[in-house]
Design a protein with these regions (language model features):
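Acidic, surface-exposed loops and disordered segments
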Residues: 1-178
Length: 178
């Protein structure tokens, strides 16, 4: 394998976590993960995304119910994670989906580097198009008519004994023009 450093190590070792302990993550660690998201590249540096950190259990559970309903299940789509970081981005920016996706990627790598588990959970777009979703955003000072949900980051301490193994990288993943 090629050269290594702490960034490449985090990239190679990160896995989606689908089992969490109930213990709340300290606010300082949540802030560190969220701050990593703010350093993501954005189209023309316009920083279209916002991050809504949810640590209130009642709101977290409400989001879980909404998300599960969209998915057509009754199980917790956040896998028991105590913290949900919601990424939304300004709809009027043509790069908003890409911008928000990079924010989520940065936060997943930061979580890995801090020994936290994380998992990107979809259906944020559908969730925050509803009046119920917009009311939740309003609590955080976000106008749900101007922002589109990009994704949720479930965040917490992993409850598994051993991290899942990565699937081998597929052959021909990288193509060259030399």
């Amino acid at each position: 394998m090629a050269e290594t450093n702490v960034v490449l190590d985090a990239i190679r070792s990160r896995r989606s976590c689908r089992a969490y302990e109930g213990e709340m993550v300290p606010k300082e660690l949540i802030e560190t993960v969220a701050e990593a998201g703010t350093w993501a590249a954005t189209g023309m540096g316009r920083q279209s995304p916002v991050i809504v950190a949810v640590t209130d259990k009642a709101v977290r559970d409400e989001l879980s119910e909404m998300n599960a309903k969209i998915m057509g299940t009754t199980s917790d789509p956040f896998y028991g994670a105590p913290v949900i970081l919601i990424v939304l981005a300004l709809k009027k920016r043509p790069t908003h989906i890409y911008d928000g996706s990079l924010v989520l990627g940065n936060m997943m790598l930061a979580a890995e580097s801090l020994g936290l588990g994380s998992c990107w959970i979809h259906r944020a777009k559908e969730e925050f198009e509803t009046e119920e979703g917009k009311k939740i955003l309003e609590k955080a000072g976000v106008n749900g008519d101007e922002y589109e949900g990009i994704g949720h980051l479930a965040l917490g301490y992993p409850s598994y004994e051993e991290k899942p193994k990565a699937a081998p990288r597929k052959p021909g993943y990288v193509k060259w023009v030399e």
